[in-house]
UniProtKB/Swiss-Prot annotation:
Main localization (coarse): cytoplasm
Stated family: Belongs to the class-II aminoacyl-tRNA synthetase family. Type-1 seryl-tRNA synthetase subfamily.
Protein known as: Serine--tRNA ligase
Species of the source: Haemophilus influenzae (strain 86-028NP)
SUPFAM superfamilies for this protein: Class II aaRS and biotin synthetases (SSF55681), tRNA-binding arm (SSF46589)
Entry keyword set: Aminoacyl-tRNA synthetase, ATP-binding, Cytoplasm, Ligase, Nucleotide-binding, Protein biosynthesis
Domain notes: Consists of two distinct domains, a catalytic core and a N-terminal extension that is involved in tRNA binding.
The protein's annotated pathway: Aminoacyl-tRNA biosynthesis; selenocysteinyl-tRNA(Sec) biosynthesis; L-seryl-tRNA(Sec) from L-serine and tRNA(Sec): step 1/1
Molecular-function GO terms, alphabetical: ATP binding; serine-tRNA ligase activity
GO cellular component: cytoplasm
Amino acids binding ATP: R266, S267, E268, E353, I354, S355, S356
Top enzyme class: ligase
Reactions catalysed according to its record: tRNA(Ser) + L-serine + ATP = L-seryl-tRNA(Ser) + AMP + diphosphate + H(+); tRNA(Sec) + L-serine + ATP = L-seryl-tRNA(Sec) + AMP + diphosphate + H(+)
Length: 429
């Protein structure tokens, strides 16, 4: 949620930025009208409350003097009804303003390039040289099926399209990748490993910005009688970031760096017909997520660090990749600046996204009321939150299978993974 003071004091400027940079049309007339109502109702409520307090004192004094207070009590009842009505109207207006505010995307940082979609993203760097092969390259689907390790037919039987079953050495490599990533982030990058619920309540989803705008992208449970509704997490960012919801953090404890390996669940609404085969776009996939809660003056520096941590995974696995700065038209709803890391996939002869690292500024913190305070200070500040994939495990598996394939259909195990796979150096044929 963007700063409500910006909406009150710089509405026209904010609306223009949202239009140009986010292609978002803010209804300024409606917001202005609601803000006028809010001010009037606020004044009315405060005046009625002050008058009610004064009348209450007058009744007490009249009672001491032995006067008939029945008429005064009747007036108090009437004033109480007026106050209740005014408060209800004020609450309704505030709720309507809040709903509009929840629908507004974050404002991009000044250095984010203007653009309509991913074709206008800015490439920052390339690392590694794409592998060349002297044989016909196979895609990960063929490699996985030939190794008897990927079974998409079984996934479809059990659950439907965009599900897969992994077995044997492929399943072991999938697990090894997640363990390798967690060990790297906890032992070398200073993250605290966390285990979090895979089902979360709606307050948690509002906190990180999935609700109310992106409800259709989630898998929701049917609430039993007396139970609250839940949704399956689309990313560990949701529960991990919300660990600081409604918390005032000592600034000396910042930054807080957390990582978690979880399954992620996405409906992929709007992705019909895209990546229908293979592991690239699944309803259920694993990801190792990195989250940082930082001093609001240091979040851009933290974004560079966090992105570097994701890059380190690719570098240690010797997987060629490129780093791109997303343009305004390709950024996520809550982000003010995002880097994507795209790994080279030989079978597709292109780079594909494997990590997205974002600085959310104070957008999520304002929704969550996550704040920090220096020792001795009375005033609190909103923290800044960042998140990034470190990495998407399934897509990393795809990259390893395709980049490390051999002419006979076997796959060489990257050196970094061998300790996690019992010393195996080759899998498959």
């Amino acid at each position: 949620m963007i700063d409500p003071n910006l909406l009150r004091n710089n509405l026209a400027e904010v609306a223009e930025k949202l239009k140009v940079k986010r292609n978002f049309m803010l209804d300024t007339e409606k917001l202005t009208a609601l803000e006028d109502q809010r001010k009037n109702l606020q004044v009315t409520t405060e005046n009625l409350q002050a008058e009610r307090n004064a009348r209450s004192k007058a009744i007490g004094a009249a009672k001491v003097r032995g006067e008939d207070i029945a008429p005064l009590l009747a007036e108090m009842d009437d004033m109480g009804n007026q106050l209740t009505e005014a408060k209800a109207q004020l609450d309704a207006v505030l709720a309507e303003i809040n709903q509009i505010a929840l629908s507004i995307p974050n404002l991009p940082a000044d250095e984010v390039p203007l653009g309509k979609d991913d074709t206008e993203n800015k490439e920052i760097l390339r690392w590694g040289t794409p592998h060349t092969f002297d044989f016909e390259v196979k895609d990960h689907i063929t490699l996985g099926e030939e190794a008897n390790g990927l079974d998409f037919a079984a996934g479809a039987k059990l659950a439907g399209a965009r599900f897969a079953v992994m077995k044997g050495q492929i399943a072991k490599m999938h697990r090894a990748l997640a363990q390798f990533m967690l060990d790297l982030h906890t032992e070398q990058h200073g993250y605290l490993e966390t285990y979090v619920p895979y089902l979360v309540n709606h307050a948690t989803l509002y906190g990180t910005g999935q609700l109310p705008k992106f409800g259709e992208d989630l898998f929701h449970t049917l609430a039993l009688e007396g139970e609250q509704p839940y949704a399956l997490i689309p990313t560990a960012e949701v529960p991990v970031t919300n660990l600081v919801r409604d918390v005032i953090i000592d600034e000396a404890e910042l930054p807080i760096k957390m990582t978690a390996h979880t399954p992620c669940f996405r409906s992929e609404a709007g992705s019909y017909g895209r990546d229908t085969r293979g592991l690239i776009r699944m309803h259920q996939f694993d990801k190792v997520e990195m989250v940082q809660i930082v001093d609001p003056d240091k979040s851009m520096e933290a974004l560079e660090e966090l992105t570097g941590h994701a890059e380190k995974v690719l570098q240690l696995l010797n997987l060629p990749y490129r780093k791109v700065l997303l343009c305004t038209g390709d950024m996520g709803f809550g982000s003010c600046k995002t880097y994507d890391l795209e790994v080279w996939l030989p079978a597709q002869n292109t780079y594909r996204e494997i990590s997205s690292c974002s600085n959310m500024w104070d957008f999520q913190a304002r929704r969550m009321q996550a704040r920090c305070k220096a020792k001795g200070d009375k005033k609190t500040r909103l923290v800044h939150t960042l998140n990034g994939s470190g990495l998407a495990v399934g897509r990393t598996l795809v990259a390893v299978l395709e980049n490390y394939q051999n002419a006979d259909g076997s796959i060489t195990v990257p050196e970094e993974l061998r300790p996690y796979m019992g010393g195996l150096d080759v899998i498959g044929k």
